[in-house]
């Protein structure tokens, strides 16, 4: 359940995250492998939801909850990435998440990757809410709607 104390919090608390590049995230050339940006995006989104106050088990299937027990599923229907500079082991980056609700059943997550204040990459990932049993579009959950609304506040 979402704590009401969040009403007074700054969205930066759950939308701006920091990470360090690890050896296992690099390729044979010693730079971050391209797919890592998408993995980091999903991890950033998950961490953002948790910091906001949404339990991941309420959004994603777990070993205790399968997809059919959830009210909605949020598959990715479009994603794209731009890479402006390589990243290496030990680089510290900031990941900034911006949200945009498209309509009652979809939203876009936009991520900016910054190193030393300079943008070095970006991604856009569009999700659509579907009924996990019928696989048809449906309205976003109350929790996700609230997170999107409060996350879209200028910070």
From Swiss-Prot:
Gene Ontology molecular function terms on file: 1,4-dihydroxy-2-naphthoyl-CoA thioesterase activity; fatty acyl-CoA hydrolase activity
Family classification: Belongs to the 4-hydroxybenzoyl-CoA thioesterase family. DHNA-CoA hydrolase subfamily.
Pathway field: Cofactor biosynthesis; phylloquinone biosynthesis; Quinol/quinone metabolism; 1,4-dihydroxy-2-naphthoate biosynthesis; 1,4-dihydroxy-2-naphthoate from chorismate: step 7/7
GO BP: phylloquinone biosynthetic process
Protein name: 1,4-dihydroxy-2-naphthoyl-CoA hydrolase
Domain of life (superkingdom): Bacteria
Active site: 27
Keyword Ion transport tagged: no
UniProt entry tagged with the keyword Hydrolase: yes
Catalysed reaction equations from the record: 1,4-dihydroxy-2-naphthoyl-CoA + H2O = 1,4-dihydroxy-2-naphthoate + CoA + H(+)
The EC number(s) this enzyme carries: 3.1.2.28
Keywords: Hydrolase
Pfam families with a match to the protein in the record: 4HBT_2 (PF13279)
Function: Catalyzes the hydrolysis of 1,4-dihydroxy-2-naphthoyl-CoA (DHNA-CoA) to 1,4-dihydroxy-2-naphthoate (DHNA), a reaction involved in phylloquinone (vitamin K1) biosynthesis.
Disulfide topology: none
């Amino acid at each position: 359940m979402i704590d009401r104390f969040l009403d007074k919090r700054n969205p930066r608390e759950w939308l701006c995250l920091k990470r360090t590049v690890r050896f296992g995230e690099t390729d044979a050339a010693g730079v971050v492998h391209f797919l890592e940006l998408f993995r980091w995006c999903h991890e950033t989104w998950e961490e953002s939801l948790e910091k906001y106050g949404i339990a991941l088990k309420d959004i994603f299937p777990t070993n205790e909850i399968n997809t059919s027990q959830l009210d909605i599923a949020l598959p990715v229907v479009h994603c794209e990435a731009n890479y402006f500079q390589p990243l290496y082991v030990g680089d510290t980056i900031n990941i900034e998440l911006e949200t945009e609700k498209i309509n009652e059943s979809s939203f876009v997550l936009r991520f900016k990757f910054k190193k030393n204040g300079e943008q070095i990459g970006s991604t856009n990932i569009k999700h659509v809410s579907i009924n996990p049993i019928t696989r048809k579009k449906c309205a976003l959950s109350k929790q996700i709607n609230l997170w999107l609304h409060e996350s879209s506040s200028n910070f």
